[in-house]
């Protein structure tokens, strides 16, 4: 079953959008790769393309976008989005945070992220190494691909300063997976956080997007199941429906859905 959030309470609908903690989400990812043989690279590409699809659907007139990529898998999703955006006629600029372009894989970077970073370079997408004193230009939209669900502990001081800088822009901000600085399980702020206009999340809905600070910082929510088989949600159970129905912390949200049975995005209107 799926959930639309209306007047603060989840209403059951005919799509499956399970709600999970990060540890359960990671189990789903492991199943997708090990049992259903969908590679990490394929999942990264599916999610990056879905993020770009939603961006175009939600903001069809946007042309100049700035994508802030961390060195983890969330950054890899940002690199995929950049490539897709260029194919669709946009002008993407990538800001590399905590790393820089390299012809050899850095020790702490997953090979899939390095592959997508180099694919951007080969396609002529401008890659900038971020520094606090650099001019960020005048983007029409900002993409947050810094950490996703991979943030542990508090946001580092230099990242906190970047988030404050980005928050000063008056353009839409699209977060991939989870806004930077928000705990994907608890919805709490990890020191500092970037408030998104919209957040696109994948495979399952993360509880932290719907409760506490996360319900505000996530903005509108888009969900894409990455073509996951329905059986996977029986293998790893999410949050019990009863616990959601009894919760007073669930916030009325605008949520966009797309799964393998749909060609476009469907909006839950609260």
UniProtKB/Swiss-Prot annotation:
Give any Pfam family that matches.
YjeF_N
Cite the SUPFAM superfamilies for this sequence: YjeF N-terminal domain-like
- What molecular function terms (GO) are annotated for this protein? metal ion binding; NAD(P)HX epimerase activity; nucleotide binding
Keywords for the protein's UniProt record, in alphabetical order: Isomerase, Metal-binding, NAD, NADP, Nucleotide-binding, Potassium
Annotated YjeF N-terminal domain ranges read: 25-234
Q: Record-annotated residues binding K(+)?
A: 74, 144, 180
Q: How is the cofactor bound?
A: Binds 1 potassium ion per subunit.
HAMAP family given for it?
Answer: NADHX_epimerase
Name used for this protein in its record: NAD(P)H-hydrate epimerase
Q: Which gene encodes it?
A: nnrE
